[in-house]
């Protein structure tokens, strides 16, 4: 190498080093390395990524900026990532400047093959049209009733018998896998009216369910790889891209058959005047003012399955784990359930487990809803979400975000900040969701509690999710006491969804309801039973009551 080239190389390295020193001082948060940016730290902390992000946010006051590619001209644009958990910043992104923070091209490219332009993967007018159409359906009581039927049938005929078998045989069961199967069956029933039967004795494999899981896994892997690399693998037919292609073929074939059959059924129903189908797919197909393509209908079903399956199953897994480590909370929940059932079904405990809880019974379980909400605060099903910045903007805390960069809001960290939730923010404390004045459930600000998203994109199925979670939780806790299997280690799986890495292996024990009933009904006076620690309230509004309350029997 001649002298001129050597001097040029030294000058380039020196210029880069000066630039790097300047940008390192400008960025705050995790350490930034030359060229690689913050990627080394991200890789090093991959097994505890969400806690690591939370620690950095605490140290930086709720917002920090870093770069994943420390290269001039990229570090402050495409390579720049702003990370925040500040409620004001989250409200700014998800509501105030909603149009400036879409999902963006990266997200859409990753999920396009799987979800197309469905509601979960679209922006702008495409998203708005589907949102308005779906919102009309989610406000109907008939959809809630349909969800209730699928949930209760699955609990009674499959879920509870499997748990009872595990109890009788003294065998541990992976509760996360079992709940995931149950919620998958439920959401498929609600989405397109088909029983996938994945939660059945023997836990059979279902071709559609397996293809759906493989397609989800392959799509999520694309987030880890640079776009040019996964596109190259797709073009060459390598790795999980092969699995994705095959799985999508199976999914499309299954749903096309469902759609074609449903079209014929709906045609016959119109001719006979009998309406039998109330699933989401049928509701879209029955709209007289629209004619949807099979591709659109297929994506409608897939988007709602993806959005609706994991939220409930992941939340319930963490809920049951927390319950095993907080016996006082468990006792309060069981007492609340039993108190409601004494009112609605009497003191014969055999009637309590004969059928799953009905709407009016589930609606009155205030403390249970508080415990589930507290679970979602600490362990949100989707721990991090990201938005693309369309135009230069300044967040409410003064952080400048340039066009072309991305902003990640940490839902996990938002639930663990002392500035938002107090000094006891890391404690599992359902009481923070109950008003000390009247015992009613407290709905915290949606930009502090972001487990169901917020703003125009807030989860349409939030109420259905609570209905499903409360019904399943009540069914389990009413019949069983759970303990984590000896030696089983509960860890977070680093994914877009906060699954447990090793599942949740539990031992199932029988709950003695007679003892609980006697503690709630200690004595009788004439025809009045005195209840201790009951939940009282009208249908649709729960009131947690600690004092003894007399009710006629």
From Swiss-Prot:
Which Pfam families has this protein been placed in? Answer: p450 (PF00067)
Q: What class of enzyme is it?
A: oxidoreductase
Which keywords fit this entry according to its UniProt record? Heme, Iron, Membrane, Metal-binding, Monooxygenase, Oxidoreductase, Plant defense, Transmembrane, Transmembrane helix
Cofactors: heme
Q: In which tissues is it expressed?
A: Expressed in leaves, stems, flowers and siliques. Expressed at low levels in roots. Expressed in guard cells of cotyledons and leaves.
Lineage: superkingdom = Eukaryota
Induction section of the entry:
By abscisic acid (ABA), auxin, wounding and drought, and in etiolated and dark-adapted seedlings.
Entry's Gene Ontology molecular function annotations: alkane 1-monooxygenase activity; heme binding; iron ion binding; oxidoreductase activity, acting on paired donors, with incorporation or reduction of molecular oxygen, reduced flavin or flavoprotein as one donor, and incorporation of one atom of oxygen
Q: Name one GO biological process term.
A: defense response
**Does the UniProt entry include the keyword Transmembrane?**
yes
Q: How does it sit in the membrane?
A: Single-pass membrane protein
Q: Where in the cell is it found?
A: Membrane
List positions binding heme: 459
GO CC annotation: membrane
Q: Which reaction does it catalyse?
A: an organic molecule + reduced [NADPH--hemoprotein reductase] + O2 = an alcohol + oxidized [NADPH--hemoprotein reductase] + H2O + H(+)
What does the record give as EC number? 1.14.14.1
**Which residue ranges traverse the bilayer?**
2-20
Tell me, according to the record, the phenotype of the null mutant: No visible phenotype under normal growth conditions, but mutant plants have reduced content of cutin, loose cuticle membrane ultrastructure, show increased permeability to water vapor and display enhanced disease severity to a virulent strain of the bacterial pathogen P.syringae.
**What does it do?**
Catalyzes the omega-hydroxylation of various fatty acids (FA). Acts on saturated and unsaturated fatty acids with chain lengths from C12 to C18. Plays a major role in the biosynthesis of extracellular lipids. Involved in the biosynthesis of hydroxylated fatty acids required for cutin biosynthesis, cuticle development and repression of bacterial type III gene expression.
* Stated family: Belongs to the cytochrome P450 family.
Recorded protein name is Cytochrome P450 86A2
Protein species of origin? Arabidopsis thaliana
